[in-house]
């Protein structure tokens, strides 16, 4: 019955979208499709709504116990000082790359300036379709005024129609500040991503502080499948994978997907790789099956080494 449940859920979503359009509340709102029908059909606008701010939480598997409030704040601030995790940064870069192409406009990325942290790596961003030439990085000193300055910079950028997307790494935000960002996005038609290092122990979405963001996501890393490219060694990690949890969305329902990023060649070196089709430029998200549904790869027999009659090493399998 799962197929019928998904069909019924998509039908309900379309009916709800028609009703909202009929009431004039959100008719004709533009969106940024993720390119995965299962996700785009589930979201009320057929993708991430523009003229809106979306919240993306960075999961933390190290915090499995329930700490006190002070320990929770310390853990979040320590992670913020060390930088957001790779999964949420890569996921946001992939969304920014899609917005960069779809809206033909530059992307602004706001982050704290910390000596121990490096800036975003251009060649790595290109792997997710984000062109560094159209990326404006705003690094703000990580002092007591960082949050206020970062929120001001994000608000001003969201009001600018010439900006395709605004990413901001912000540790904490209250409801009033998030409403200002949402109002700025609605005024300028901007698309904002709030990247936050929320502790992983906040499994209950209701326990997280409320914001005015249109949607709230939580991103965590998944084991990647072995690389299937002929020019790469076997058993090398393949494309990045994420567990994308939609914790809440206006006019919609929570849901979880497992995604993989497919990069079929937008970097300049792929044409020289053996077995690569230099004419392919497609890249984007794709759904993958949960780990429990994928067949287990057979374990390769390891050779054992023994000594021959003359002291020479002999390898055999079995």
Please report, for each region that a protein language model flagged, where it lies by residue.
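Generic beta-sheet signal
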Residues: 110, 193-197, 220
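Conserved nucleotide-binding/hydrolysis micro-motifs of P-loop NTPases
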Residues: 113-116, 172-174, 198-202, 250-251
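Conserved P-loop NTPase nucleotide-binding/switch module
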Residues: 176-200, 210
């Amino acid at each position: 019955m799962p197929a019928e449940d998904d069909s019924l859920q998509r039908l309900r979503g379309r009916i709800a979208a028609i009703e909202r359009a009929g009431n004039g509340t959100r008719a004709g709102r533009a969106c940024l499709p993720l390119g995965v029908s299962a996700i785009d059909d589930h979201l009320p606008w057929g993708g991430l709504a523009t003229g809106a701010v979306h919240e993306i939480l960075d999961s933390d598997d190290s915090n499995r116990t329930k700490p006190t409030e002070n320990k929770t704040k310390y853990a979040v601030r320590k992670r913020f000082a060390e930088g957001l995790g790779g999964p949420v940064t890569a996921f946001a870069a992939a969304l920014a790359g899609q917005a960069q192409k779809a809206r033909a406009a530059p992307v602004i990325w706001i982050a704290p300036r910390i000596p121990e942290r490096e800036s975003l790596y251009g060649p790595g961003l290109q792997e997710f379709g984000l062109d560094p030439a159209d990326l404006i990085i705003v690094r703000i000193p990580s002092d007591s005024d960082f949050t206020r300055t970062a929120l001001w910079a994000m608000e001003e950028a969201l009001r600018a129609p010439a900006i395709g997307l605004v990413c901001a790494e912000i540790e904490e935000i209250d409801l009033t500040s998030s409403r200002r960002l949402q109002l700025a996005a609605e005024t300028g038609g901007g698309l904002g991503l709030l990247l936050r290092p929320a502790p992983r122990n906040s499994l209950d979405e209701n326990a997280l502080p409320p914001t005015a963001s249109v949607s709230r996501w939580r991103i965590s890393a998944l084991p990647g499948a072995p690389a299937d490219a002929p020019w790469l060694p076997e058993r090398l990690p393949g494309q990045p994978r994420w567990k994308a949890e939609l914790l809440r969305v206006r006019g919609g329902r929570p849901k979880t997907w497992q995604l993989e990023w497919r990069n079929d060649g937008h970097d300049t070196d792929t044409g020289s790789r053996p077995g690569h089709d230099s004419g392919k430029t497609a890249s984007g998200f794709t759904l993958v099956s949960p780990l429990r549904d994928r067949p287990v790869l057979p374990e390769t027999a390891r050779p054992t080494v023994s000594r021959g009659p003359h002291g020479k090493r002999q390898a055999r399998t079995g």
